[in-house]
Amino acid sequence: MGTDPLIIRNNGSFWEVDDFTRLGRTQLLSYYLPLAIIASIGIFALCRSGLSRYVRSAECDLVNEYLFGAQEERKEDNSIERLLRNSNTQANYVNVKKQGRILKLRHFDITTIDVKQIDAKNHGGLTFSRPSTSDHLRKSSEIVLMSLQIIGLSFLRVTKINIELTNRDVTTLLLFWLILLSLSILRVYKRSTNLWAICFTAHTTIWISTWIPIRSVYIGNIDDVPSQIFYIFEFVITSTLQPIKLTSPIKDNSSIIYVRDDHTSPSREHISSILSCITWSWITNFIWEAQKNTIKLKDIWGLSMEDYSIFILKGFTRRNKHINNLTLALFESFKTYLLIGMLWVLVNSIVNLLPTILMKRFLEIVDNPNRSSSCMNLAWLYIIGMFICRLTLAICNSQGQFVSDKICLRIRAILIGEIYAKGLRRRLFTSPKTSSDSDSISANLGTIINLISIDSFKVSELANYLYVTVQAVIMIIVVVGLLFNFLGVSAFAGISIILVMFPLNFLLANLLGKFQKQTLKCTDQRISKLNECLQNIRIVKYFAWERNIINEIKSIRQKELRSLLKKSLVWSVTSFLWFVTPTLVTGVTFAICTFVQHEDLNAPLAFTTLSLFTLLKTPLDQLSNMLSFINQSKVSLKRISDFLRMDDTEKYNQLTISPDKNKIEFKNATLTWNENDSDMNAFKLCGLNIKFQIGKLNLILGSTGSGKSALLLGLLGELNLISGSIIVPSLEPKHDLIPDCEGLTNSFAYCSQSAWLLNDTVKNNIIFDNFYNEDRYNKVIDACGLKRDLEILPAGDLTEIGEKGITLSGGQKQRISLARAVYSSAKHVLLDDCLSAVDSHTAVWIYENCITGPLMKNRTCILVTHNVSLTLRNAHFAIVLENGKVKNQGTITELQSKGLFKEKYVQLSSRDSINEKNANRLKAPRKNDSQKIEPVTENINFDANFVNDGQLIEEEEKSNGAISPDVYKWYLKFFGGFKALTALFALYITAQILFISQSWWIRHWVNDTNVRINAPGFAMDTLPLKGMTDSSKNKHNAFYYLTVYFLIGIIQAMLGGFKTMMTFLSGMRASRKIFNNLLDLVLHAQIRFFDVTPVGRIMNRFSKDIEGVDQELIPYLEVTIFCLIQCASIIFLITVITPRFLTVAVIVFVLYFFVGKWYLTASRELKRLDSITKSPIFQHFSETLVGVCTIRAFGDERRFILENMNKIDQNNRAFFYLSVTVKWFSFRVDMIGAFIVLASGSFILLNIANIDSGLAGISLTYAILFTDGALWLVRLYSTFEMNMNSVERLKEYSSIEQENYLGHDEGRILLLNEPSWPKDGEIEIENLSLRYAPNLPPVIRNVSFKVDPQSKIGIVGRTGAGKSTIITALFRLLEPITGCIKIDGQDISKIDLVTLRRSITIIPQDPILFAGTIKSNVDPYDEYDEKKIFKALSQVNLISSHEFEEVLNSEERFNSTHNKFLNLHTEIAEGGLNLSQGERQLLFIARSLLREPKIILLDEATSSIDYDSDHLIQGIIRSEFNKSTILTIAHRLRSVIDYDRIIVMDAGEVKEYDRPSELLKDERGIFYSMCRDSGGLELLKQIAKQSSKMMK
C-alpha cells in the first residue's frame, strides 16, 4: 500500500489543470471527508438527548393535540366554575369582566374544542403505515452491501496491497463504514427520523465523492490497476446503495398517518421516500388517475394532519394569545417556515448563477484556438457542471416554492377562520360612521364577504411574494458581485443605473398599491350593492328597479375601471423600464469598458456579461412586481386587521349569571342600539325593572315600535347596556351544557320575528344539530302544525328549503323556526311574534298544542305578540311596553283587574270543534294537487330531481376537460376580435426580433477584431481586465456599435410598454363588456334562477371571477404570448447555429407535450374544484352573518366555526394538490431543460471546429433561456387557462333564461301612449293555471274570478293554500300554463314588464329595507319632494299630524331629534336592523303610498303590526286608496272583514268568493270556520253586517 508522499504528483496541491491530484483524492476525499462525517455523527450523538427531546416534542405536538384535546383549557374552565360556586363571590355575582372573558373564550376560542370529540363526531383518527416487504428487502440489501464494502476495506488493510491510499485513509474509511452499518442495523429496531437522516446524508456525501476518482480513472490520471479496481468497486457499491437509500421511506418503520372520518384518502406526503419527495413522484398516481377519470372532490386526497384548519387555528390561537397585531402574529407563527424558505432561496440564487460562470469558462476554451486535450476535458466538465446545476436548481426552486405554498395554505385558513369567528362575535349594532371615518371599513355583509373572497387570498399569497422578493434581492446582489469581478470598475456604471431604477420601481409600486386600494374600495361598494340587490331580488323585480340598480352598479363599476386603467398605465411604464433597464445597464457598462478603460470586448466576456444582465432582468422585473403585490397585500392585510379590531359583542360582559341559575330579570336597565349614540333622544329601553316568571308563559305586549323585539335582544345581550343589570340563568356554550332529569338544559332558544333558516333540509333545520329523538321530533312537528306541510312537500322533511327558506311560505318558515326552538333542549324559549305569519286555524293550534302544550312543560316562554285575544288565556305574566318603557306589568289577573285589556280582546269564543279542525288533521291534497303554495316574496321552482330526492339547490356546474374553444371565442369577441389579437401578436413578434437582434449585434461587435477606441477626452489609465485585449486599429468606431445597440434596446422597450398597454386596454374592454352583460343577464333572469342558485354562488361570479378577469387574466395572457413567441424564436435561432439541435428539440417537444398534457389535465380540474369549493365558504358565511343573533342565542358558535373550517379544508385540499401538481410539472420541465443545456453544449463541443465563440455564446445562452421559456410557457398557459376558468364560469350565466320584458311577440301591447294605465283597476282572471317548473303539476288550477274597479278584495285561506301565488302571477313572476290575467281588459302577458310592474304596487309580507337613509328607502330615485315623503310617513303614523304640520310650515330641512322619522337622513342599517319589524313594515307601506297606484296588493302587510296600528293602516288604505283596487292577503280576518268581497282559497283553488256577510251565513263554509277559530266570530259578524249595509 503506497505511503511515500514523494510519488504524489504536484505535492501540496489538490487540483491540477483538469482533475484532482492524488493528494486531493487521498487526503481530501478519503481521509478528511469521512473524518468530518464521523465527527459530525459524534457531535450529534453527544447532543442527542436534548435534540431528541426537542424533535420528539415538535413531532408529537399534533399527536398530543389529538389525544388530549383541550384539557388545559378545561382546567381553566374548571377554575372559573369553582369561582362561580364560591359563596364569597356569589354575593357580587362574580367578577363580571373576568367571567365574561372566559365565557367568550369558551364560545368562540378554537383552543377549547376537543378534536377527538366534536359535536359527538370525530374529526379524524391516527393510524400507522407499516413497512412493506419491499421495505424490508431494501434494508437487508443495504446491510449486505455495506458489509461487502467493509470486507473489501478490511482485505486492503490486512493484505497491504499497494494502492494510492495510505493505511490512515483505509482505516478512516473502514471506521466510517462500520459506524454507518451500526446505525443502519439500529434503524431496523428503532423508529427514528434522525437516524435515517444521518445515514442518508453520510452515504450521499460519500457517494458523490466517489464520482471524482472514477472520472480520474476515465481520463487516465490513475495509472496503477489496484487503485483503479478499488475505486470502481467503491463506486459500484455506493451507486447500488444510493437508489436503495433514495427509495426507502423517510421514516424507516411505521409512520403516523392522520385519516379523516369522511373517508377521504389520506395524504401520501409523509410516507414517501426522499426520491419521491424530491421529484414529487408521490403525486404521480393521483395525476395518472386524473388522465383516466375526471377528478371529483371525493377523489382528492386528504391533507397532512398539520394542514387541517382546526389544527392550524388551534396552534395560531395558542401561540398568539397576547399578540394583538395580526402581522406580528402571522410572522410569529411562520418564522420557522420563513427561515427554511429563505435558506432554499439562498441556495437557489447561488446555484442559478453557477451555469453562467461555467459558461464563461466554457466559452474561453471555445475561443482559444490552441486547445489541448486537458482543455477539452475541462470543457466537458463545465458542461456536465451546468447540467448538474440545472438539476439542483430544479430541486431547490420546487422545494422552496412548496414551503411558500404551505405557508399560503395555512395563512388562508387562519384569515378566513379569524374573519368568520369575528363575524360571529362582533357587535351587531354600532354607532354610525362619521364623515371622518369614510375611508375606514364598513362592515356590511358585502364587505365582509369581500374580505374572505379577495383580501384573505391576496394576503395568503404574500408568502410566495416574499419568497420571490428575497430571491430577487439575493440574485441582484450576487450578479452585481460577479459583474464587478468580471468587469472591474466599469460594473459600477451598471450598478448606478440599477440604483437609479430602484426608487422608480418603488414609486411605481406605491402607485400600484394606491390604485389597488382605490380599486378595492370601489369593489367593496359594488359587491355590497349587488349583494343587497340579490338578497332582495323579488323586491327589485316587484318595483321594476332593475335598470336603476344596474345604472347604480355600473356607475360604481366605472370608478373601479378608472382605477384599473391607472394601474394599467403604471404597469406599462413598469414594462418599459423592465425592457430598457438591461439595455441601459449593459450599454453603459460596455461604454465605460471601451471608452474609459480603453479595452476591447471578447466573446466569453461579452456573452457572459450579457447572460448575467439577462439574469438580472428577471429579478429586477420580479422585484418591481413583487413590491407592487406586497403593497396590494399590505392594503388587504390592513383591511382585515381593521375588521378584526372592531368591537366584539359585550353580551358576556353585560349579562350577569344568576347565582341560583334560576332568574331572568332586568334591574333598572337602560339599553340602546348604539353604545355611543350622540342623539340623546334616540330610542332607548329605559329603566327596565322586570322579573320574568321561570317555567311559565310570559307575554310582551305593546304597539309597533314600543321596543318589544328590542327587549328580547337586550335579554340576549345584543343591545348595549348603558346602566343597570340583566340577570340570566346561564351563558354556557351549547355543547358544554348538561341536561337535567327531564332532558332540558339551562339555556336559551330563540325564534326571531323574521325566520332565519339554513340552506338545508327541513329536518336539519329543526334538529339544529341536537340529539335526534324521533318521538320528540314527531311531537314537535305535530305541535307546530307542520305535519300536513311535510306530507305535501316532495320529499317530506328531507326536502331542501333553499337559501333563506326560499321554497317555503312565510308561515312555514316561521313554524320551522318555532319548531327548532321548541325541539331544542333549552329550558328558556324566547319567541318574537311567531304567530303573526300564520292563519287563525294554525295560530290557535300552535298556541294550544305548542306554546302552552306539553312540550313547554316546566319551560320558561317569553312571547312577543300582538294577538292579545288568543294569548292571554293560559299566560301567567305580561309586560306592556310603550316608547321603550314598561307601562304595566304583572300577572294576567292583576292587569285585567286594572281594566288594561278590553273585554272584546279577551273574550274567547267556543272551540268545541278545534280537535276536528286542527292544523294537522286537515286532509292532505291529492298528489296531483298543489305541491307547495308560495308567498309572494318566496317562490319555489322545483325540478325533477327535487321531486325525487328533495334537493332544490342545484350543484354548481363544473365543466370537464380542456376549456372549450367556444369560451375563447366568447372572450375574444369582447376582447376585440381576431384583428386585435393579430395586432398584438405582431407587436410581440417585432419586440422579440429586436431582442434577438441585440445579441446578434453584440456578436458582430466582438467578432470585429479591428475596433478602434476613439474616445478623446477620457484620460484614465487602463485597468487590467480578464478577457480583454488591446487593439490599435478597427473597422468601425465603438461609438457606432453602442449607438445601434442603444437604439435597438430603446425601440424594443418602447414596443414592450406599448404592447403591455394595448393588451391591458383590450382586456379592460373585455372585462367591462363581460361584467355589463352578466349584470344585465342576472338581474333580468327568471325568478326560478334565484330559487335554485344560492346568492353566495352568484356573488362568487361577481367577486372572485370578475376579479380574476379584471386583474389576473390579462397579465397571464401577456406573458403567455411573450413566452410562446420567445420559445419559437429561440428554437429557430439555435437550429440555425447548431442544426443537430433540431433533433433534440423534437424529442424535447414530445416530452414537453406529454408532461404538459398530464399536468394540464390534472391542474385544470383541480383549479375548477378550487373555484367551486370557494362558493360554499361564501354562502355559509353569508348565512351565518344573517343569523348570528340566533346562533349566539343558542350558544352554538362552535359548530358553525367547525363547519366553516370543514369548508376551508375542502377548498384547501384542491388548492394544495394543485400546488403540488405545479411542483411535479416544474421539476420535470426543469429536468428536461437541464438535458437541453447538456445537449446544446455537447453539440458545440462536437462541432467546435466550425463554431466561433460568438455563435457558441448565443447558442448556449438561448439554450438556457429556452429551458426557462418552455417551463414558463406551459406553466403560464396553464395558469392562463385556469384563469380562463373564470371566463368559462361567467359564460355559463350567458344562457340564463330571461324574463320576457317586452311581452309576447304576438299582439304585443307596449302602452307607450297610455302613461296612466291602468285607468280603472279592473282585474279579470280566466281559467288560470300555474306551476313552478315545466315538469311539475300545477299549483294553481283553473282559477277564475273578476275584481271590479276600485273594489276591496280579501284573500284568505290556510297557509299554503295558494294565496300568494295568485299575487305572484299578477307580476308575471310565473307565466300561466292556461288561462290569462287581464287588467282593464288588457292581457298582461302582452304588456311590457316594466310598465306592468310599475303600474301595480305590492306591500309584501317581509319588509325589506336597504342600507342608507329613510329617504333613500322611501324614495330611492328622488322622484318625490320631501313634503310628499313626510305626508306618506304621516299617513302610516310614523310621524304625528302635529309633526307633519310643523314640517309643512318649515322652509328649512327639518331635523328634529324627537322622532327619528322627522330626519329623512336618519341612517338605516342593512336590512333595516336598527328598526323594529313593525317600523320596517310601516316604512315600506309609506314607500308604496307615494306611488299612488290604481292596483295595490297587500301580502300580510300588517301581520307584524299591533292591532291598533293595523286598524289605523286599514283606515288609511280605505281613505287614501278609495279610488284604487285593493287585493289583501290576510291571516287577521279583522283586517278584511269589511272588504267588498272575500276569496277563500284551498289547495290552489278558489273555494268561496262572495261578500263577507254572505259567506258567514254558511256555517259549513270554510270562511265561517276560520272566523269561528279566530276567537272573535260574533264581532266579525257584526262588522261584516255593518259593512254590508254601508255598501248597500
From Swiss-Prot:
**GO molecular function, one example?**
ATP hydrolysis activity
Q: Which InterPro entries match?
A: AAA+_ATPase (IPR003593), ABC1_TM_dom (IPR011527), ABC1_TM_sf (IPR036640), ABC_transporter-like_ATP-bd (IPR003439), ABC_transporter-like_CS (IPR017871), ABC_transporter_C-like (IPR050173), P-loop_NTPase (IPR027417)
Q: Which UniProt keywords apply?
A: ATP-binding, Glycoprotein, Membrane, Nucleotide-binding, Repeat, Transmembrane, Transmembrane helix, Transport, Vacuole
Sorted alphabetically, the Gene Ontology cellular component annotations on this record are: fungal-type vacuole membrane; mitochondrion
Where does this protein hold ATP 2? 1357-1364
- Signals that turn on the gene: Under the control of the iron homeostasis regulating AFT1 and AFT2 transcription factors. Up-regulated upon SUB2 overexpression.
Q: Which residue positions carry a glycan here?
A: 11, 370
Q: Which residues lie on this side of the membrane: Vacuolar?
A: 1-33, 96-100, 153-170, 351-379, 487-489, 594-614, 1011-1051, 1137, 1251-1252
Q: Where in the cell is it found?
A: Vacuole membrane
Recorded superkingdom? Eukaryota
- Which residue spans traverse the membrane? 34-54, 75-95, 101-121, 132-152, 171-191, 330-350, 380-400, 466-486, 490-510, 573-593, 615-635, 990-1010, 1052-1072, 1116-1136, 1138-1158, 1230-1250, 1253-1273
Residue ranges annotated for the ABC transporter domain, each copy included = 664-908, 1323-1572
- Specify the ABC transmembrane type-1 domain's residue ranges: 338-632, 981-1282
The GO biological-process annotations, alphabetized, read as: response to metal ion; transmembrane transport; xenobiotic detoxification by transmembrane export across the plasma membrane
* A Pfam family of this chain: ABC_membrane
Which residues face the membrane's Cytoplasmic side? 55-74, 122-131, 192-329, 401-465, 511-572, 636-989, 1073-1115, 1159-1229, 1274-1592
Similarity annotation:
Belongs to the ABC transporter superfamily.
**Which PANTHER family does the record match to this protein?**
ABC TRANSPORTER ATP-BINDING PROTEIN_PERMEASE VMR1-RELATED (PTHR24223:SF353), ATP-BINDING CASSETTE SUB-FAMILY C (PTHR24223)
Q: Tell me what this protein is called.
A: ABC transporter ATP-binding protein/permease VMR1
Name its species: Saccharomyces cerevisiae (strain ATCC 204508 / S288c)
Gene name, per UniProt, is VMR1
